Amino acid sequence: MSSRSTGERPFTDIITSTRYWIIHIPAITILFASGFLFVYTGLAYDVFGTPRPDEYYNSDNTKKPLVNKRFEAKQQLDEATKNK
């Protein structure tokens, strides 16, 4: 099988070029900063609908529901949520 060129630049030429890094350094920095702010501001919790760490258990329900028997788990969880 003969190896023919596809006419594309080799990957090593691309990543060692100055032009590549001039374009990608700001882009990578902006992506990192925006991802950090997305999580840090709590917007990720709002977008994905997950509770914030301080909202998992309210002041009325400070104990985790405990399941003792494997086959009665649904019944035990229903009782634990009914007591709220």
UniProtKB/Swiss-Prot annotation:
Membrane-spanning residues: 22-36
Gene Ontology, cellular component aspect: photosystem II; plasma membrane
Annotated GO MF terms: electron transfer activity; heme binding; iron ion binding
One protein family per Pfam: Cytochrom_B559a
Cell compartments where the protein resides: Cell inner membrane
Keywords associated with the record: Cell inner membrane, Cell membrane, Electron transport, Heme, Iron, Membrane, Metal-binding, Photosynthesis, Photosystem II, Transmembrane, Transmembrane helix, Transport
Membrane topology: Single-pass membrane protein
Gene3D superfamilies documented for this protein: Photosystem II cytochrome b559, alpha subunit
Comment on bound cofactor: With its partner (PsbF) binds heme. PSII binds additional chlorophylls, carotenoids and specific lipids.
Any one GO BP annotation for this protein: photosynthetic electron transport chain
Cofactor(s) demanded: heme b
Residues given in the record as heme binding sites: 24
Matches recorded under InterPro entries: PSII_cyt_b559_asu (IPR006217), PSII_cyt_b559_asu_sf (IPR037025), PSII_cyt_b559_N (IPR013081), PSII_cytb559_asu_lum (IPR013082)
Biological role: This b-type cytochrome is tightly associated with the reaction center of photosystem II (PSII). PSII is a light-driven water:plastoquinone oxidoreductase that uses light energy to abstract electrons from H(2)O, generating O(2) and a proton gradient subsequently used for ATP formation. It consists of a core antenna complex that captures photons, and an electron transfer chain that converts photonic excitation into a charge separation.
Family (UniProt): Belongs to the PsbE/PsbF family.
Record text on subunit structure and interactions: Heterodimer of an alpha subunit and a beta subunit. PSII is composed of 1 copy each of membrane proteins PsbA, PsbB, PsbC, PsbD, PsbE, PsbF, PsbH, PsbI, PsbJ, PsbK, PsbL, PsbM, PsbT, PsbX, Psb30/Ycf12, peripheral proteins PsbO, CyanoQ (PsbQ), PsbU, PsbV and a large number of cofactors. It forms dimeric complexes.
Protein name per Swiss-Prot or TrEMBL: Cytochrome b559 subunit alpha
Source organism (scientific name): Gloeobacter violaceus (strain ATCC 29082 / PCC 7421)
Name of the gene encoding the protein in the UniProt record: psbE
